[in-house]
Amino acid sequence: MNNFLKVSLLAAAVAVSLTACQKDEKTAANTAEVKAEASKPAEAPKAEAKSFEEQSGYAIGLSMGRYIANTLERQQELGIKLDNSVILKGVTDGLGKEAKMTDEEIQKVLQQYDAKINELTKAKADKDAVENQKKGEEYLAANAKKEGVKSTESGLQYQVEKMGTGAKPKATDIVKVHYTGTLTDGTKFDSSVDRGEPATFPLNQVIPGWTEGVQLMPVGSKFKFFLPSKLAYGEHGAGSIPANAVLVFDVELLAIEKPAADGDNAKK
């Protein structure tokens, strides 16, 4: 049985119960404040601090509730919406030792639930991948017609924003660059500029679009690259990068680094 599901169901109930409690407490607090203001001209005294146990319990529940709320929200995007009142009923019955399902039934249902989530997730991912492929092809076709955009045989597109005067790196070189990577809609997924520190790496150990593109740049250049998914992360994507996504990179080639000497490597 998926341990995550155990946590999901319990925490979802906690989140719902906390929400209900917060509403009741807020209403009661507002009523008390009105009465206090009406009867006392001076500032109302501060409420006593909650006990360590109460604060700890609330903090744990609130943290869990927020995490699960985000999880359930993503599941709703797949078409699954759990009834909060039923979740609370299950928790109440469990605490009261009045379970209406056996352990075997619980395990079977949660396994089915897990399988359903996986099925819907895969279906959505497959659908998104097809849509991204189509959108990417349309984007690149239109982009290729823009002034200043050049294309290579591999399908890589680039635009020169500043042409440097230094040497061009080879695939086996180590380069130092500043870059910002975005999706075609402008969503930023990575940036050495934001981190305030250039990136240094062997040029033949990055995605193909980078290996090819940066070799076109003399040191001191600034290029904008448009990478077809086949030259980036392909049908699998990576992290926040969707499958079959076209990527856009603003790259500044700062330097070609010398490889560390054997003696230096031995010291590390």
Curated annotation (Swiss-Prot):
Superkingdom as given in the UniProt entry: Bacteria
NCBIfam families from the UniProt entry: PRK10902.1
Subcellular location, principal: periplasm
GO biological process: one example: protein folding
Cellular localisation: Periplasm
Annotated InterPro entries: PPIase_dom_sf, PPIase_FKBP_dom, PPIase_FKBP_N, PPIase_FKBP_N_sf
Listed name of the protein: FKBP-type peptidyl-prolyl cis-trans isomerase FkpA
Residue ranges occupied by any PPIase FKBP-type domain in the UniProt entry: 172-257
Free-text function comment from the UniProt entry: PPIases accelerate the folding of proteins. It catalyzes the cis-trans isomerization of proline imidic peptide bonds in oligopeptides. FkpA probably acts in the folding of extracytoplasmic proteins.
Record's keyword terms, sorted: Isomerase, Periplasm, Rotamase, Signal
Catalytic reaction list: [protein]-peptidylproline (omega=180) = [protein]-peptidylproline (omega=0)
UniProt entry tagged with the keyword Metal-binding: no
Family under the similarity heading: Belongs to the FKBP-type PPIase family.
GO CC annotations on file: periplasmic space
GO molecular function: peptidyl-prolyl cis-trans isomerase activity
